[in-house]
Amino acid sequence: MKIKPAMAAMTAAAAAAIGVAAAPFASADDVEVQSLGQPAALTDGNLVQHWTITGLKPSTDSIPYRPIGTLWEATATDEAIAGGATPIVSNLNARAKNGDTYRVLFGVATPQGVNPSTLAQGEKTTGKIYFDVTGATPDSVVYNAGGNDLLLWVQPPPAAPAATCAPEPQT
């Protein structure tokens, strides 16, 4: 039996589509969510690193980059918990509630930035990361690798109001 080239192409395309449809996708359940200021674990086999993001805010720093929008900053810490770790700063993004996402300005080297050198177990590096915000105000930072959100830091919930005690009546 001879298969016509067009039929073979359609069969291959259908098989590829089924393979893509059946491929696993990362879901929101796969994302570790923490409040800004709390560490989030990034695990790759036996290697574990903790990223902590704090202080997401508009920046007044002078860096060798002219933003199109407003320059924002956060402080990032990466700690090698188990095994060595290489801080991949380029995977960090600021994100707004409406989904606007701003890639970290990883190509703009600054003295106050995160050192991208490999860390030995127990070592950590801390520095500022910057974003050019051209739309909605960011309220979170996400660590995204290969199109999948892995870690997410959000604004902490507001503190509960302090309980007030009425003074006891005097007798």
Predicted regions and their residues:
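Conserved functional micro-motifs across diverse proteins
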Residues: 2-171
